[in-house]
Amino acid sequence: MRFKNTLFLLLIFSSSSILSSQQYIDDLGSEFHKKKRQEFREQMPQNSIAFFFTAPIMKRSNDTDFMYHQDPNFYYLSGWREPHGVLVIFKDDQQDNNGLYNEILYVREKNEYREMWDGRRLGLNGATQ
């Protein structure tokens, strides 16, 4: 009996660490999201800007959060699954010192200390892929 209990606990701890280390898989692909942003942009009025915000993190109790679920509209247009992000879509091309752009995705930077508590973040490099 003790062997079964030990085996059961070992199985639980090993499976939870495997599941928590998995990466995001976007089955739709970046081209799908890019196409949907372009279709949305074509329907926008002239000289307009659209803002899309990620879903908030919902607290279960003082110490735990519910499993995070991204806002479907935000995910549909961006493919981004992490909290604390903003997608800005411009109808017309904008220009700055770096060139032309018509959309901006604001995301959290990588932070090893916070990742220890909140989980892995893709950061700026992950957003550009």
List where the protein language model places each region:
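A composition/biophysics-driven feature that prefers long, compositionally simple stretches
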Residues: 2-5, 9-12, 20-129
